[in-house]
Amino acid sequence: MALFGTAGIRGSVRTDVTPELAVAVGRAVGRDATSETAAARESEVVVGRDGRTTGGGLAAAVEAGVRSGGASVRRLGVVPTPALAFASRGRHGVMLTASHNPPGDNGIKCFVDGVEYDRDRERVIEERVAADPETDPDAAPVAWDAWGDGHEESVLDAYRAAVADYAQGYGAPLGGCPVAVDCGNGVGALATPTILRDLGASVETLEGNVDGHFPGRESKPTPDSLATLRRFVADGDAAFGIAHDGDADRIVIVDSGGETVHEDTVLAIVAERYVRASDAADPVVVTTPNASARIDERVTAAGGRVERVRLGALHEGIASAEAAGGDVVFAAEPWKHIHPGFGGWIDGVTSAAVLSRLVAEAGLDALRDPVTERPYRKVSVDCPDGKKEAVMARLEDAIPESFPDADIDTEYGVRAEFADGSWTLVRPSGTEPYVRVYAEADDVDELVGEVSAVVESAVADI
């Protein structure tokens, strides 16, 4: 039974992420926590949730499962996902969130020692959830006198203080810098505005009440959903704007003209600063195949190098790079950043704090100026799930044949890079019946058209 996707378990609360599933996953996590021969603290599981209306019931179900699996629960209540991850250092954690999904969805993310479960741990959870409690003792509740206890625990003050302290190592004091923060009625409202004010910013907050109905805008921060923030920044005095999704693991930046800054430009700015600030012999930035070559340009200019890993596998990429002797200073997918110097989790709140101090130091325009910003597009080509493997095998030959002057990498899809810095990536969607085509080029429409035609031909031929 495959439960976990690239970002935990996620789906409708009516059919997918049900209370029954939450109990079973909680019990499996409790068993996982108590099976380790370690300090007693490691048999604790911190449980938190975002502001979704179904979060309270699902958190109670997870707690019942964890405690019946023999581990103790520490209830964090409503918190950002990065705060839950922060609290899970030295123990396990479960976060109830569907991130940027619609309000009728929810999800489960599992952590250990500040890092999301790797695929091996996820498989163990899946096996225990699928097992029959009547025949498999590991799937059944522990003995009545071995159940764990449950207590409230507060983490927000400690998390906010830790983020502010870390961010002060970069950039300059905010000194009244005007910042607009669109929390999207998500739990980022409990952290980012307070931290930025503590750092000296003048903060104006939009959609700052936590509400699981997401009445202000859809939870996913896109140029369209951020129309109010964009107008607010363009018409007001804010130096820039910040937006989060429902659980504050994502961050979007809006410039003073009210335009969203491309996610890869934000990634390149932070990556370059971390490399320049590092005294490591081999500073590494880990990112994904769909990330722009502008990141490579700025990281290389700063004296570092870029390693790419499949989408949803940043932690694996960090481990691989460090095993090879590199010192990972930053890891990111577009809009989702890991700050290894602070913690091993995706953290949009910390990104907001660090970026704010960088902007206060130099201005957003100056930070963007050295970044090559070519036009970027992503399109989807229809492809039945059953054809994807054969289509991708065909494209491993067809793309090089169609673009003989390109450098080809087939480790995570088919990526073609050209001498002028433009590139394209073709990869199958993991959740929908499409093959995705990503491209960045001065004439991006022409490149996307040529690549899409090759993909459509491969789909038709299979």
Regions found by a protein language model. Give the residues of each.
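Proline/glycine-rich low-complexity loops and linkers
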Residues: 67, 76, 130-159, 255-334, ...
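N-terminal small/polar loop signature for handling phosphorylated ligands or for N-terminal nucleophile
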Residues: 46-105, 195-254
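Phosphate-binding and adjacent anionic-ligand microenvironments
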Residues: 281-438, 444-462
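An N-terminal, well-structured beta->alpha segment
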Residues: 1-62, 68-69, 91-92, 148-176
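A short, gly/pro- and small-residue-rich
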Residues: 104-132, 254-267, 342-355
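Short glycine-rich phosphate-binding loop at a beta-alpha junction
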Residues: 40-50, 74, 178-179, 283-289, ...
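Gly/Ser/Thr-enriched, mixed-charge loops and adjacent short helices
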Residues: 104-229, 233
